[in-house]
């Protein structure tokens, strides 16, 4: 259970960064070779700094109007963890508001720097 708590701590720090603009320690949440991909596995960010910057950019430039999560699942095996969830969000940027929903799949690994996100896949459900 202590292992699961350590994984959840990293997930909570990442969540606090984009939702509460609490960026302290965000970079440490990502492995140096972390990758974020989207639909069709298009690469959005690669490397610790770029992944952290993507969260800072969204938190700084988008106003989240509504957000909810469901279907949480966390599985931990020795030094690997997979966390998945579904989400719905409405947010505002300069171009206007946008409503999206989808799922996230996060893979974390336990290394010399503790638990870190190594891979994130973001799926956006097709617009209805």
Regions found by a protein language model. Give the residues of each.
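A solvent-exposed, acidic/Ser-Thr-rich amphipathic alpha-helical stretch
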Residues: 5, 10, 23-77, 98
């Amino acid at each position: 259970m202590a292992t699961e708590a350590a994984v959840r701590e990293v997930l909570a720090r990442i969540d606090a960064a984009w939702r509460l603009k609490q960026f302290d320690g965000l970079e440490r949440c990502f492995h140096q070779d972390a990758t974020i991909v989207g639909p069709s596995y298009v690469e959005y960010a690669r490397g610790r700094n770029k992944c952290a910057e993507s969260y800072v950019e969204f938190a700084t430039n988008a106003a989240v109007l509504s957000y909810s999560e469901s279907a949480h699942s966390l599985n931990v095996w020795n030094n690997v963890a997979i966390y998945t969830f579904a989400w719905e969000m409405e947010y505002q940027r300069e171009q206007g508001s946008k409503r999206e929903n989808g799922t996230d799949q996060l893979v974390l690994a336990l290394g010399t720097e503790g638990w870190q996100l190594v891979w994130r896949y973001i799926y956006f459900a097709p617009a209805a």
